[in-house]
Amino acid sequence: MARKWMRLLIASLAVILLAGCSSLEEQTIDGLENAKVAFQDDAEKPNEKVNDMNIFLPSGFSIEEESDETNIILSKGKDSFILFINPNELPSSQLYYDLMTSDSNLEVLDEKTFEQNGRFGFAAIIENSEEKYELITSIGGIKLTTISEQQDIANNLENMMLIVRSISTN
């Protein structure tokens, strides 16, 4: 009888552990959908200021001191995020998307483009190493990148698009 309970307990724990670990495919699908929703929703109200620019930073994000006007380094815990701002590009610009898709050295696992109200945006997941992925979110001349672990892809893409969406350059 004790053996049956032990097997049931082990089987239950295995199911719980497996359910808690999302696959790369699930993280990718959820992350791209999260980025799409963040792109289409109203921009978050800015809660930080960098130079002359207002920006929304989700909880836990901070601005690093060595940032300048066009390259802003953000951090959340041990993760770094680099925000590139090209003020010469309009919100409809596809510059960063075209650069990514023309680079044959990149192994793009999945990407999705978005268009709304004269804005062009995209989110992409690029293989960086066996267990790390480069994430990109962009709208026009604003691009945010990070290196992410698999289990953080969906959450990072959502937060990244919320940040990018909150910035107005033109």
Which functions belong to the PLM regions below?
Residues A2-L9:
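Bacterial N-terminal signal peptides that target proteins for export
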Residues I16-G20:
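C-terminal motif of bacterial Sec signal peptides marking the signal peptidase cleavage site
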Residues S22-E25:
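Bacterial signal peptide processing site
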Residues T28-E66:
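N-terminal "mature-domain start" segment
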Residues Q40-P46, E69-I72, E115-A124:
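Short, hydrophobic/aromatic-rich segments at coil-to-beta transitions
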Residues V50-Y97:
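Secretory pathway targeting signatures of secreted, lumenal, and periplasmic proteins
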Residues D103-Q151:
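Signature of long, low-cysteine stretches enriched in small and polar/charged residues
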Residues L144-N170:
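Surface-exposed amphipathic alpha-helical segments
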